Design a protein with these regions (language model features):
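Short amphipathic alpha-helix that is part of the acyltransferase structural core
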Residues: 1-37, 54, 62-84
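Hydrophobic residues on conserved beta-strands that form the core of alpha/beta folds
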Residues: 4, 124-125
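Conserved acyl-donor/pantetheine-binding loop and adjacent beta-alpha core of acyl/acetyltransferases
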Residues: 74-122
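Conserved active-site alpha-helix within GNAT-family acetyltransferase domains
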Residues: 111-113, 141-142, 166-184, 189
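Conserved GNAT acetyl-CoA-binding A-motif
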Residues: 116-123, 151-164
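Conserved beta-strand-loop-alpha-helix junction that forms the acyl-donor binding cleft
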Residues: 126-135, 160-171, 188-193, 198-201
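Conserved acetyl-CoA-binding loop-helix of GNAT-fold acetyltransferases
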Residues: 127, 136-149, 176-177
Length: 204
């Protein structure tokens, strides 16, 4: 039986498991290429930030899936730079040496705070991941249901997320099935086509 809960301060030791799970679920993603130490630092920041967090799905105390989210994404990015820039730089040094093009892309990612600003208060579902061996068991839906349950839609206009538009049919269908609506599609500076989805709660 899966237990869905918010990761608390006493369980930060599980950040390493979350980083490994990200690596196995998204082996070809840019952040994965930056290495496990980088991922550990990133997900630690979600537990450290008062307006962010990680929801986990556990079975026998083993993490099988998670969501990382932020109630103030622009502020979250600013805090990454102010508090952990040197740590991120150190963690990604090896990847930058192997792939110099990563440097420009990483700088662009850290300068994202102005891009994620929106008129309304919203919650960013920044990452959702399920152990590939556990797919098809409803873990992703239960994680999203927990995200919906802890969101006060009288304060936040919607839950926002982004995902690849191409060769990603299963994920796009999954979000639509779970009540998300396509808000826009766009192309990143690297030429990656993305879909942005929003969930407005029961008010729409």
């Amino acid at each position: 039986m899966y237990q869905i809960r918010i990761l608390d301060e006493s369980n930060k030791v599980k950040i390493s498991t979350i980083a490994e799970l990200h690596k196995h679920a998204f082996p070809d993603f840019f952040l994965t290429q930056l290495g496990i130490p980088f991922l550990r630092t990133l997900y630690f920041c979600y537990t450290e930030d008062s307006e962010s967090g990680i929801i986990v799905a556990e079975d026998s105390d083993q993490i099988k899936g998670f969501i990382a989210y932020s109630k103030d994404y622009p502020r979250f990015y600013n805090q990454l730079i102010k508090k952990h820039l040197l740590r991120f730089a150190f963690c990604s040094l090896g990847a930058a040496i192997r792939h110099p093009s990563f440097i420009k892309r990483l700088l662009r990612a850290f300068n994202k705070s102005h891009e994620v600003k929106k008129e309304e208060a919203y919650i960013e579902l920044a990452s959702i991941c399920v152990d590939p061996k556990e797919e098809g068991k409803g873990i992703g839906t239960r994680l999203i249901d927990k995200m919906k349950a802890i969101t006060d839609f009288s304060v936040y206009a919607y839950i926002n997320l982004e995902t690849d538009a191409c060769e990603n049919d299963a994920a796009n269908k999954f979000y639509i099935k779970n009540g998300f609506r396509l808000n826009r599609s766009y192309v990143t500076a690297e030429g990656r086509r993305m879909n942005e989805y929003r969930y407005y709660g029961e008010k729409r």
